[in-house]
Design a protein with these regions (language model features):
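N-terminal membrane topogenic signal
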Residues: 1-12, 55-59, 106-107
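Alpha-helical transmembrane segments
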Residues: 8-20, 61-69, 113-121, 167-171
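Membrane-interface capping segments at transmembrane-helix boundaries
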Residues: 202-212
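Membrane-proximal helix-loop-helix units in multi-pass membrane proteins
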Residues: 83-122, 127-145, 149
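Membrane-helix interface and helix-disruption motif detector
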Residues: 23-38, 74-90, 125-140, 179-189
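Alpha-helical membrane-embedding segments
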Residues: 65-79, 96-101, 119-130, 147-152, ...
Length: 212
């Protein structure tokens, strides 16, 4: 019963506040600033309702749709000539997808499929919206850690993870160096630092066993 009262209070409070903000906005200025507090207020009753039902899947779906709608609105108001909201779609859509997949979301195959889809999406976006610079390598670098960490975490191959992770970092910095400033070789500095990761794993793990 208390949860019902909490939801009713959240719903009534949100509606009253949104109406008040819209009225104040219409009386003070022509700029629709009311959308910012309205966006936050809409999350309140929805969060309370989903918590009551213990339905995290519904929460992820509705929250993602509201955030996407907010970004589309903000994009249309501020810079309608450039659809920047498209950059935020993959992580926002991944949330409900992984929530719906439930236990299957922990599989390495799911991580590989989702990562490949996200990377492919950003490559396509890169080629269509801004082909001048291959910026897709940045989100690709971040996303590749997902299946990599999941696989080595499940197999408990931590030393192999340090090697494969180091190779990924080395490849990333080498690519960024070659693309942005090919006449100045600066990638050796972060590469030197990352090499300490597998080196320390080797001496701490394997050498420790030999000493024991």
């Amino acid at each position: 019963m208390k949860k019902d009262i909490a939801f009713q209070f959240a719903l009534a409070g949100s509606i009253m506040t949104i109406i008040f903000i819209i009225v104040v906005n219409s009386l003070s200025t022509t700029y629709p600033w009311f959308i910012y507090p309205t966006f936050a207020l809409l999350l309140w009753p929805i969060g309370v309702f989903c918590a009551k039902k213990k339905n995290h899947k519904l929460l992820s779906i509705v929250y993602s749709l509201i955030i996407i709608a907010f970004l589309v609105t903000e994009n249309y108001i501020q810079t309608p000539e450039y659809p920047w909201f498209l950059y935020a779609l993959p992580p926002l859509l991944c949330w409900p997808v992984l929530a719906i997949l439930d236990k299957h979301s922990k599989k390495v195959s799911t991580a590989i499929l989702c990562s490949a889809s996200i990377i492919g999406y950003y490559i396509m976006l890169n080629l269509i919206l801004s082909p001048q610079h291959p910026w897709a390598i940045y989100p690709a670098f971040a996303v590749l850690w997902w299946p990599l960490a999941l696989y080595h975490g499940k197999t408990r191959t931590f030393y192999a993870f340090s090697i494969s992770g180091s190779l990924l970092v080395i490849a990333f910095f080498a690519a960024v160096n070659a693309i942005t400033t090919p006449d100045h070789i600066w990638a050796v500095y972060p590469i030197f630092c990352i090499l300490w990761w597998p080196l320390s794993m080797y001496y701490y793990g394997f050498k420790k066993k030999k000493i024991a």
